[in-house]
Swiss-Prot record:
InterPro entries: GatZ_KbaZ_carbometab, GlmS/AgaS_SIS, SIS_AgaS, SIS_dom, SIS_dom_sf, Sugar_isomerase_AgaS
Function recorded in the entry: Catalyzes the isomerization-deamination of galactosamine 6-phosphate to form tagatofuranose 6-phosphate and ammonium ion.
Gene Ontology CC: plasma membrane
Record-stated family: Belongs to the SIS family. AgaS subfamily.
Domain of life assignment: Bacteria
Catalytic activity: D-galactosamine 6-phosphate + H2O = D-tagatopyranose 1-phosphate + NH4(+)
Keywords: Hydrolase, Repeat
GO BP annotations listed: carbohydrate derivative metabolic process; phosphoenolpyruvate-dependent sugar phosphotransferase system
Protein name as it appears in the record: Putative D-galactosamine-6-phosphate deaminase AgaS
Lineage: Bacteria, Pseudomonadati, Pseudomonadota, Gammaproteobacteria, Enterobacterales
Source species: Escherichia coli (strain K12)
Length: 384
């Protein structure tokens, strides 16, 4: 870790704030490093990607799992390859349901520490189940088991993130977004690379700058008891991650939920009352956006929630009919790029809500029952 890596400049004096703020710089550092590794990456990946029946699973635990939820749909449609997202927590408990020995597998394991018991076990199970198995761990910790095991394996290529993304705060912030950007750059370099992604970094930097010292809050302050994040497609993954940030940093004092706008009508909408904040991540795709705006207008007509906020790249009559945030000006972003912008608001909201509720964001679990690196997991050996 660099000697000058301190939270001294953070208004809140927390690692969490520092780690939120340095994200745009960390992304460009990582993608520049991937540029330098491109030849070695291609040597490893190109023979695999030529296999017609190759399965590519994006995996991780908790926030690391949500990376796959956010980017796998776009990677699958963009590349035509068989990308899917399966958490390590599912791979470990039900390997027989997800690991098919008849198909070669590339397992992309995301991990901040690289030491989560399920992450290490998932790699071992994949090797055990699938005769032709390859690994691309993307991790923030050079000393972690994911990285160390991979550099000593013939069937793996280890991708290490910049040291500052190994977040010291409890919640994953710069770690998730840097691993996410890096994976996109690996598999879609013509769209996501160190040059094109500067637009994303600049827009997110503008968001963070616009929030000043964070003291005003992102969505204001009100006595809400629950928050719901809504997003379509991969943005539902961003909504899920946004909800988890609130749960983690407030230690569950603010109940948080997520769904897709269309799915929300099918029962979950029952939770909305006059103590509920609803945040809608509006898609940049003109077709999908219609569904987001339909639900946004419906929630406002219902007049049941305390506040319904839209975050969108551009305004419209429906967006502007109530509380809303318009992203800073930039070129057109596809949703997988826009997800980074939405996460800037969500991370900052969770941080400030934590402080507002009297929590310590870097160590929010006063009881110690929830840990930065998960503890208490017993890994049981597979028996066919």
């Amino acid at each position: 870790m660099p000697e000058n890596y301190t939270p001294a400049a953070a208004a809140t004096g927390t690692w969490t704030e520092e780690e939120i703020r340095h994200q745009p710089r960390a992304w460009i550092r990582s993608l520049t490093n991937i540029d330098a590794l491109r030849s070695a990456l291609n040597n490893f990946l190109e023979p695999l990607l030529r296999k017609e029946n190759l399965r590519i699973i994006l995996t991780g635990a908790g926030t690391s799992a949500f990376i796959g939820d956010i980017i796998a749909p776009w990677l699958a449609s963009h590349t035509g390859k068989n990308f899917s997202a399966v958490p390590t927590t599912d791979l470990v408990t039900n390997p027989m349901d997800y690991l098919n020995p008849a198909h070669p597998l590339l397992l992309i394991s995301f991990g901040r520490s690289g030491n989560s018991p399920e992450s290490v076990a998932a790699v071992e199970l994949a090797n055990q189940f699938v005769p032709e198995c390859y690994h691309l761990p993307i991790t923030c910790n050079e000393a972690g088991a994911l990285y160390q095991n991979a550099i000593n394996s013939d069937n793996a290529f280890a991708l290490l993130m910049p040291a500052e993304t190994h977040d010291r705060g409890f919640a994953m912030t710069s770690s998730i977004t840097t691993m996410m950007a890096s994976c996109l750059a690996v598999f879609a370099p013509e769209t996501i690379n160190s040059q094109t992604f500067r637009d994303v970094a600049d827009r997110c930097q503008a968001i963070l700058t616009s929030l000043g010292d964070f003291s005003e809050g992102v969505f204001g302050y009100a006595p809400w008891k629950r928050i719901v994040y809504l997003g379509s497609g991969g943005l539902q993954g961003a909504a899920r991650e946004s909800a988890l940030k609130v749960l983690e940093l407030t230690a569950g004092k603010l109940a948080a939920f997520y769904d897709s706008p269309t799915g929300f009508r099918h029962g979950p909408k029952s939770l909305v009352d006059d103590e509920t904040l609803v945040v809608v991540f509006v898609s940049s795709h003109p077709y999908t956006r219609q569904y987001d705006l339909d639900l946004l207008a419906e929630l406002r007509r219902d007049n049941q929630a305390m506040r319904v906020i839209a975050i969108a790249a551009e305004s419209s009559d429906i967006v502007a009919a109530g509380p809303h945030i318009i992203l800073p000006p930039s070129r057109h972003f596809i949703d997988v790029e826009q997800a980074f912008c939405f996460l800037m608001y969500a991370q900052t909201f969770a941080l400030m809500q934590s402080l507002h509720m009297g929590n310590t964001p870097d160590t929010p679990s006063a009881s110690g029952t929830v840990n930065r690196v998960v503890q208490g997991v017993i890994i049981h050996p597979w028996q066919a």
